Swiss-Prot record:
Protein's organism: Rhizorhabdus wittichii (strain DSM 6014 / CCUG 31198 / JCM 15750 / NBRC 105917 / EY 4224 / RW1) (Sphingomonas wittichii)
A Pfam family that the UniProt record links to this protein: NDK
Oligomer status and interactors: Homotetramer.
Required co-factors: Mg(2+)
Active site: H117
Enzyme class, first EC level, given as a word: transferase
HAMAP family per the UniProt record, alphabetical: NDP_kinase
Name by which UniProt lists this protein: Nucleoside diphosphate kinase
One Gene Ontology CC term in the entry: cytoplasm
Any one GO BP annotation for this protein: GTP biosynthetic process
InterPro entries linked: NDK-like_dom, NDK-like_dom_sf, Nucleoside_diP_kinase
Gene assigned in the entry: ndk
Compartment(s): Cytoplasm
Length: 140
């Protein structure tokens, strides 16, 4: 098994409820190590750029508005099969379909306010990490 990196966002619904520590603890309990982390308030331009792949989707405007509605915590996570492990601990996008004990089942308010984002592939993880972090900000 290879050690890899993935990208995670703790979304505004979770930071608003002071869940950053609880969510990070679940990630660490799953064997992921936080190698970079910062709390930011995304600009509209950042959110539109980050979620640009969804630009033509009907939910794009609402997604951008939500992601700029409050602070987020962007993180680089490292571990064995980090992308798959992070997605497993996050749970299904819709918290109603998420397994018990997952972040979304435990903390999400709705399919839109689902507390976390995680990269869906190693390739996208690199793109997403590079969007928010300089190499010197990642300390393994």
């Amino acid at each position: 098994m290879a050690t890899e990196r993935t990208f995670s966002i703790i979304k505004p619904d979770a930071t608003r409820r002071n869940l950053t520590g609880a969510i990070t603890a679940k990630l660490e309990e799953a064997g992921l190590r936080v190698v970079a982390s910062k709390r930011i308030h995304m600009t509209k331009e950042q959110a539109e750029g980050f979620y640009g792949v969804h630009r033509e989707r009907p939910f794009f405007g609402d997604l951008v508005s939500f992601m700029i509605s409050g602070p987020v915590v962007v993180q680089v996570l490292e571990g064995e099969n980090a992308v798959a492990r992070n997605r497993e601990v996050m749970g299904a996008t819709n918290p109603a379909n998420a397994d018990e004990g997952t972040i979304r089942k435990t903390f999400a308010e709705s399919i839109e306010a689902n507390s976390v984002h995680g990269s869906d592939s190693a390739e996208n993880a690199k793109i997403e990490i590079d969007f928010f972090f300089k190499p010197e900000e990642i300390v393994g």
